[in-house]
A protein has these predicted regions:
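Active-site neighborhood of phospho(di)ester-bond hydrolases with catalytic His/Asp-centered motifs
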Residues: 5-7, 25-30, 54-60, 76-78, ...
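Catalytic phosphate/metal-binding cores of nucleic-acid and nucleotide-processing enzymes, i.e., regions
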Residues: 3, 17, 38-41, 46-48, ...
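Conserved catalytic scaffold of divalent metal-dependent phosphoesterases
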Residues: 9-11, 62-152, 216
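N-terminal active-site segment of His-dependent metallophosphoesterases
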Residues: 1-52, 120-124
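Binuclear metal-dependent phosphoesterase catalytic core
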Residues: 83-85, 154-160, 173-216
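Active-site environment of divalent metal-dependent phosphoester hydrolases
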Residues: 10-14, 32-38, 60-67, 82, ...
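Short, structured coil segments at secondary-structure junctions
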Residues: 21, 50, 71-73, 85, ...
């Protein structure tokens, strides 16, 4: 199975149709830049021009109310476990608190309580999709070296041990990292160049082959 992962579009979606074909496209949030539900819908319209199915979470710059839109289009991973191609996926949208008072933020304690109440948050997991990276994973390092990821996401990785974690949010931390036995992938902002991660995960392999690329 081939998965493409993109994140942090911020309304720049012209390169989506230039991405190579895959079995599944996953979007890690920030469809918009402080946009409305209608703005999210406009980006999704571009995404749906592709032939491959799509699953997604929202980012902290998207309105939380757009979760209903993802649900309506049967593509939400937020606090839901889904299966695709024999792989089990779970997602967390939004992000832990920032200094910027962005639209879709949550406290780590609040998200931990939501996870505890989620009937889907149990059992084996292959892929965690979280807009916010795990704290101290490397994918959460800002320019001054501080780790600003979510401790709740880190705890979830350490508890459920997914082989693959897909995240975004911290633009300057684009890269592939190892954390708690997982491959953690932050492709950086999608942008006009179409930055993305490609994941090849054949049946029978415990871990995928993963690399970063751009389509323009």
């Amino acid at each position: 199975m081939r998965i493409l992962f993109i994140s942090d579009l911020h309304g720049q979606c012209s390169a989506v149709t230039a991405l190579p074909k895959a079995d599944l496209l996953i979007v890690g949030g920030d469809f918009t830049q402080f946009g409305s539900v209608e703005d999210v819908a406009a980006v999704l319209h571009s995404v749906h021009k592709r032939p491959d199915p799509c699953l997604a979470v929202l980012g902290n710059l998207d309105p939380e109310t757009a979760n209903a839109l993802l649900d309506e289009q049967d593509m939400s991973l937020h606090l839901q476990q889904r299966q695709f191609g024999g792989r089990r996926l779970f997602g967390i949208g939004g992000a832990n608190a920032t200094p910027f008072n962005t639209p879709y933020e949550w406290g780590d304690d609040d998200m931990a309580a939501q996870l505890a109440a989620s009937h889907s948050n149990a059992g084996p997991l292959d892929i965690l999709v979280s807009h916010a990276p795990p704290r101290n994973s490397g994918a959460d390092r800002i320019g001054n070296g501080s780790a600003v990821g979510s401790q709740t996401v880190a705890d979830l990785v350490q508890r459920r041990l997914p082989p693959l974690v897909l995240c975004g949010h911290i633009h300057e931390a684009a890269g592939i990292y190892a954390f708690a036995g997982a491959i953690v992938v932050n492709p950086g902002p999608f942008g006009p160049q179409g930055h993305y991660a490609c994941i090849d995960w054949p049946d029978g392999q415990n871990a995928p082959a993963t690399w970063l690329a751009q389509c323009r």
